Every structure is written in C-alpha cells, then in structure tokens.
C-alpha cells in the first residue's frame, strides 16, 4: 500500500485527511501543501465514488470517514448530505478525476510548495 506519512502518526494522519476531505466537500476548494493535496486527492475521489453509488452501505462508509459538520447554515445541510445530494450527482457521467490541483507558489515562512485543490 503506497501512501505518504506526512510527518505524522497514523491516527494524526487519518484525522488530518478527514478534516481536509470534509473541508473540501463543504467549500469545494481549499489551499494546502502539495503533498497533502496529492494524498487528499485519493481520499476525496473514493468519497465521491461512494456518493455516486448512493446506497445505504455507501452512505454509512462515507459517514464513518466524513466529519459531521454543517455545510450550509441556511438549510442545515451537513457535509455528508452535501456529498450525496449535491457533489456526487454532478459527476454521474465522469469516471474518476473529480479533483484538480493547481500550484500557487511557495508559502511565506518555510517555502513549502502550496497548491489549490478543487472539485472539477
């Protein structure tokens, strides 16, 4: 199994990827480091594929990973509902490749390569 350690323990890495995946689903675009974005890409693609399946088992698998955060305060929609109701149907005809990574230059302070990862 190939993955990046990202300088964290496995629990910290899983928590960080859960947070980033939830934020990406809610905001549809986030700014992060290049290595985090590349690792996040595979996680989010799997979540969107679960959303496209749309059955109860897929919903429960996604719920086990996605954080329970409010995506839209007006409607009370949470991140999981947004994934299954808004994001996944958008990619019904697309077989993978749901995200785009665009480089934006180094971060001030430590010169880490920064990118914007967004849903296509």
From Swiss-Prot:
Gene3D superfamilies on file: Ribosomal protein L17 (3.90.1030.10)
Keyword Phosphoprotein: no
GO terms under cellular component: cytosolic large ribosomal subunit
Keyword terms: Ribonucleoprotein, Ribosomal protein
Record bears the keyword Ribonucleoprotein: yes
Superkingdom of origin: Bacteria
SUPFAM superfamilies (UniProt xref): Prokaryotic ribosomal protein L17
Example GO biological process: translation
InterPro entries: Ribosomal_bL17 (IPR000456), Ribosomal_bL17_CS (IPR047859), Ribosomal_bL17_sf (IPR036373)
Signal peptide: none
GO molecular function, one term: structural constituent of ribosome
Family: Belongs to the bacterial ribosomal protein bL17 family.
Subunit and partners: Part of the 50S ribosomal subunit. Contacts protein L32.
Protein name, per record: Large ribosomal subunit protein bL17
Organism annotation: Bacillus cereus (strain ATCC 14579 / DSM 31 / CCUG 7414 / JCM 2152 / NBRC 15305 / NCIMB 9373 / NCTC 2599 / NRRL B-3711)
């Amino acid at each position: 199994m190939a993955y990046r350690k990202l300088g964290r323990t496995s629990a910290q890495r899983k928590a960080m990827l859960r947070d980033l995946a939830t934020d990406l689903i809610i905001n549809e675009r986030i700014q992060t480091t290049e290595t985090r974005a590349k690792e996040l890409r595979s996680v989010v693609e799997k979540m969107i594929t679960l959303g496209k399946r749309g059955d109860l088992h897929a919903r429960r698998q996604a719920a086990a990973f996605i954080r329970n955060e409010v995506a839209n305060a007006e409607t009370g929609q949470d991140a999981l509902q947004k994934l299954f109701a808004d994001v996944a149907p958008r990619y019904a005809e697309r077989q993978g490749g749901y995200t785009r990574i665009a480089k934006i230059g180094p971060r001030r302070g430590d010169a880490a390569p920064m990118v914007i990862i967004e849903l296509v």
